Amino acid sequence: MVSIGMVFSAGGAKGDPFHSGVIAAIAEHTGFDSRDAELVVGTSAGSFTATALRAGLSPIDAEARHLGRELSAEGTAIVERIVTPYAEPEVKRSLLPSAPRMTLNAMLPPWKIDPARFAYGLLPDGKRSGASIAARIDELLPDGWPKRPTWIVAVRTNDGRRIVFGRDDVTGTVGQATQASSAIPAFYTPVRIGDRSYVDGALHSSTNADLVATLGFDLVIVSSVKTATADARSWRSDPERAWFSNKLDNELAEIRSTGTPVIVIEPDDTQLALLASGERVDACAAGRLAAERVLATSDGAGLRSIVESTG
């Protein structure tokens, strides 16, 4: 039986639309339905895509939802499970550093300072609550955690450690995990689960693709909106994207060192221009175009071959 793992990156409001365009294009051009992935890994916005797939929303409906098109009867029934309105109410917060321990840990041996964790620990907590995210995802998945492997990445505030909900021995509903994974530092309040607090998994990496390195998949597909193709990166004009791209390169090297092939779908200059508009429809189009560009190469032929071998 052929096994495919899928990784969905962080990306803010552009993330889920981009990923939806990617998976819709993959479905149309190769016949692979991302709902059939053996494992889905979601970081921040990518956790929305991962949970929607595990709820049964098809790639075509996922894209249609962002484009304002009519969904299938099945897709409509799934989306209508959500009854909680989306809201981001402001809450009182302290202006003291949110996680000084994390800042300290970022400077400890082996003396390779992690600038993201270092900076976050000095910032105050965010002042917006993302509680409606947890409620909505729990409504989308009323039976709780999906039966098929679903990993959602967050960062624990007290020590800066990466935590993988759905894999690690930690508590929390799938909705709480998604809220934690997308709790953007200094914007959203950290998410308290049990006696620990968590924030956005992108604080560690926008992709966290290295999590699948040793799992022995026949193929890994990474949809990454926060990185860019090598010719579209610039430390001068967009250091954050260059930073995340460098992190992803290292993760890909780790995966490939095990002999696992990887398909990476990320924006080039054309798609970056679309993403710059901030519109969901443009982010969706960017994801579709990025996927179609990659699928036109030998990577696409390889994926089609794998899909056909399972048919």
Describe the function of each predicted region.
Residues 1-43, 48-311:
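Patatin-like phospholipase
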